[in-house]
């Protein structure tokens, strides 16, 4: 293997040694299989190809200053995948099997885990697909769960710095009672046009309002939104927002640090009142928002005049990263050591 330049890694795919797989057949999950193949041999009538029976997750393994390799809240990823399975009628993967497969694939690809000082990490992508053949619209009778990994650099090339976003009314990410709360591929397909147009206009990502009234904050790109004002951490409550594990963790840390926490509808006009704002998720942890433009209304909500992250966002970012890397005390038991 040629030497990897850890410091120049993008947030992209790199071939590693192994992935792990498990089949669901005849009403039961089978044994864990190890593969070095990057491709899948799929039936042309598989439900994942025609009817969107596909759900995935994203988490990371971190090489820490003490030399150990930790993962962050993988039980929450297992629970969210189970929720997605219920939402689109796929068999739920037991938490124990999920965690065993994460552990196995990380250990088998240890040489691809970036060193601590690089700022990079090992991205873990669990994927569950309907493989059984169906021509009518109904659930498959056979499924494949697999996990592959890839070393990745920061999601945003600028690292922990503030980025501009743009409100879109032209597109909706998900319907109010649709699949927005599940991590399924269709939600991301629905965001591709909006994302492309936002990037083409010079923005970091698109910013969605609620699909029903176009009045309330929904998601920003593929991440959850939060705003800070009056020592309060405020994040939207909506039936179409993916429950972010990072956001859930930040809410707890905000409370730990003495902030009030509110999860409630946020009208667009309230953006004017926030002292800080950010997007949060596994990929970037926190991406501070420099400003949110509303091109249709000719308005701009500015949170950072100098482009630097705000003090509370910075404090929360450092605290969460500290827990993930085993630097801060893990008082909530969020991390698990996979490699000593």
Q: Which residues does each predicted region cover?
A:
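Helix-start/capping segments and mature chain N-termini
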Residues: 1-105, 127, 134-340
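Charged, gly/pro-rich active-site loop segments
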Residues: 95-97, 105-119
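Extended, Lys/Arg-enriched charged tracts that mediate electrostatic binding to polyanionic substrates
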Residues: 115-129
